[in-house]
Amino acid sequence: MQDTTLHIRHLGQQDYESVWHAMQHYTDTRNSDSPDELWIVEHPPVFTQGQAGKSEHILNPGDIPVIQVDRGGQVTYHGPGQLVVYPLLDIKRSKIGVRQLVTHIEQSIIDMLAKYDINAYAKADAPGVYVDQRKVASLGLRIRKGCSFHGLALNVDMDLAPFRRINPCGYAGLEMVQCKELGGPQTVIEAGDQLIITLSQLLGYQQLVHHQGLAAS
């Protein structure tokens, strides 16, 4: 039976690797009674290369570090002004399939942007969310022991130039776009507050409990 309470952890700006390892630890040590959590964070500039990633898609990283990680997908960029959301969910307990989870995440972004009269959409062959063929949100998950970690990155108000140093998600010439220039949420906090609402509704959570920072380990 699904626990209808979702714990939201607001992490502020945090180093990518420390949050990644904390996600792994939470997933590896959780049990059937562990709560589902949503981690809201921004990262300093970093490229992350997913398990399907190919080195030729990293064109010119320059001074931005490249980290090989254990999520699905290919290379992407994280940086200040981008909303990153990590759903740490027991999908086995809640009886949500992986494809259904991906669809819910994409739809939550689409629904949130629709509140700003932005017509966004998903693509069956290229996970993420798009507006006029430009990508506004990237998606990469990992499922372990029936539980999800990693998640989504929504471009809000950031420097998009580093995306030109890679082939985003393995697509040469893929153009990125962000919420601010589309007339969407203007800050990461605003985007996070709105996305929490749409995502929790789609996933069936009825009570949200907010926390600042990670739980003491």
Curated annotation (Swiss-Prot):
GO molecular function terms attached to this record: lipoyl(octanoyl) transferase activity
Superkingdom in the source lineage: Bacteria
Binding site for substrate: R71, G72, G73, Q74, V75, T76, Y77, H78, S138, L139, G140, G151, L152, A153
Matches recorded under PROSITE patterns: BPL_LPL_CATALYTIC (PS51733), LIPB (PS01313)
Catalytic activity: octanoyl-[ACP] + L-lysyl-[protein] = N(6)-octanoyl-L-lysyl-[protein] + holo-[ACP] + H(+)
Compartments reported by the entry: Cytoplasm
Keywords of the record: Acyltransferase, Cytoplasm, Transferase
The keyword Transferase is assigned to this record: yes
EC number: 2.3.1.181
Lowers pKa of active site Cys, annotated site positions: K135
NCBIfam families documented for this protein: lipB, PRK14342.1
Stated family: Belongs to the LipB family.
Protein's name in the database: Octanoyltransferase
Source species of the chain: Shewanella sp. (strain ANA-3)
Gene that encodes the chain: lipB
